[in-house]
From Swiss-Prot:
One of its GO terms (molecular function) is cellulase activity. Activity is enhanced by 1mM Mn(2+), but is not affected by 1mM Ca(2+), Mg(2+), Zn(2+), K(+), Na(+) or Li(+). Activity is not inhibited by EDTA (in vitro). It comes from Thermoanaerobacterium sp. Substrate binds at residues 87, 91-92, 118, 153, 261, 300-301, 328, 333-335. Monomer. The keyword Transmembrane helix applies. This is Cellulase CelDZ1. InterPro entries: Glyco_hydro_5 (IPR001547), Glyco_hydro_5_CS (IPR018087), Glycoside_hydrolase_SF (IPR017853). It catalyses: Endohydrolysis of (1->4)-beta-D-glucosidic linkages in cellulose, lichenin and cereal beta-D-glucans. The active site is at residues 192, 294. Optimum pH is 5 with carboxymethyl cellulose as substrate. Retains 80% activity at pH 6, and about 50% at pH 7. Inactive at pH values below 4 and above 9.
Length: 385
């Protein structure tokens, strides 16, 4: 072999080595993005062993572990609920079908679904038939081994004592009579108390008005023999569970809701805990239990984003504190927080599940986070071409 061939051979080997190094670095970066990123920076995003189904966990109750109260199962062990919320059932009733609930339970591995029954905006107050969708949804949740949150969705006006919401007690009485002490059901009494067209102020006085509304309903449910978990909203669109610290509701199975949207509120703000995360921590540190019954990957409007890095920070915070959560929303609306693309049917088909490319960016992300698997987004560059 002459000198020219030797040099050519060394050049060829050298290029192979360089190529191998480049490939290994690419693979390493991919691993960091899809696996080590989740496990090292956010260790509580991977795994869902605490996300137990009703058939295993049974009746829910508040328990105390190491001096802090949290949600527990019938055996006294901690449990976390993860799942999805419907959008307004007056707008997206098509999601109430067995194929959808089956896909959420089996493919997404959700153990809870929230049925958002708006009262205003074309909801229950003007169209009582929307209640039938709630009943149908409860039946499907039970059939598909999920807990179900019955959400009295107040929003506009923001005072749960307003005349438009006067049917609340009778509504919950009817549901409780139809499903007496059913272990699957969680009652959410007031979605988001707020100052819109109301005097629900962002302070103790505002909380007292919410409490005044909630207590008679809670007493009625307990007098009927229902031991179910009951969730109560709080001022400023359910971002102030801390306001109940000095005057909590006297009931052993009451939880306080917290809502946030990752494009509008961060866990960390200027190196310190953000205001909503801080409010949640204060509630927990003072003996209350918190359930995030609504959060979105978008801005608070439901659109913009999705803000997935911020979502990772939030879910790490929630999972590490065993706080249950429900994502907004099961809709094919053209907005960032919707779980499905506008072209996707809310019925995946008999015996079928939604393909990942039928999900929005938010839906794809949240599905992975409910399942507790690494988030590996598909390429969307060629979709629709």
């Amino acid at each position: 072999m002459n000198k020219w061939h030797i040099n050519k051979w060394y050049f060829f080997v050298g290029m192979l080595v360089i190529f191998a190094v480049i490939i290994s670095l690419i693979l390493k970066d991919t691993s960091l993005t899809f696996s080590s990123y989740d496990r090292e920076k956010f260790p509580h995003l991977i795994g869902n062993s605490m996300v137990k189904k009703p058939s295993l966990a049974g009746r829910l109750k508040i328990i105390e572990i190491d001096g802090r109260k949290t949600l527990g199962d019938q055996h006294g062990n901690p449990i976390q609920l993860r799942g999805m919320s419907t959008h307004g059932l007056q707008w997206f009733p098509q999601i109430i079908n067995n194929n959808a609930f089956s896909a959420l339970s089996k493919d997404w591995e959700a153990n809870v679904i929230r049925l958002a029954m708006y009262v205003g905006e074309g909801g229950y107050s003007t169209d009582p038939s929307v209640k039938e969708k709630v009943i149908e949804g409860i039946n499907l949740a039970i059939k598909n081994d999920m807990y179900v949150i019955v959400d009295w969705h107040i929003l506009n006006p923001g005072d749960p004592n307003a005349k438009i919401y006067s049917g609340a007690k009778e509504f919950f009485k009817e549901i409780a009579s139809k499903y007496p002490n059913d272990l699957h059901i969680i009652y959410e009494l007031a979605n988001e108390p707020n100052p819109t067209e109301s005097d629900i102020t962002n302070d103790i006085a505002g909380w007292e008005k919410v409490k005044k509304y909630a207590e008679p309903i809670i007493k009625m449910l307990r007098d009927m023999g229902n031991e179910n978990i009951i969730i109560v909203g709080n001022p400023e669109w359910s971002t102030r569970p801390d306001l109940a610290v000095n005057d909590p509701i006297d009931d052993k199975n009451v939880m306080y809701s917290a809502h946030f949207y990752t494009g509008s509120a961060s866990v960390w703000e200027n190196g310190n805990k953000g205001h909503i995360a801080r409010n949640i921590e204060k509630a927990l540190e003072n003996g209350l239990t918190v359930f995030v019954t609504e959060w979105g990957t978008s801005e608070a409007s439901g659109d913009g984003g999705p803000y997935l890095n911020e979502a990772d920070e939030w879910l790490e915070f929630l999972n590490s504190n065993n706080i249950s959560w429900v994502n907004w929303s099961l809709a094919n609306k053209n907005e960032a927080s919707a779980a499905f693309l506008p072209t996707t049917s809310l019925d995946p088909g008999n015996g079928k599940v939604w393909a990942v490319n039928q999900l929005s960016l938010s839906g794809e992300y949240v599905r992975a986070r409910i399942k507790g698997i690494p988030y590996k987004p598909i390429s969307r560059e060629t979709m629709g071409k």
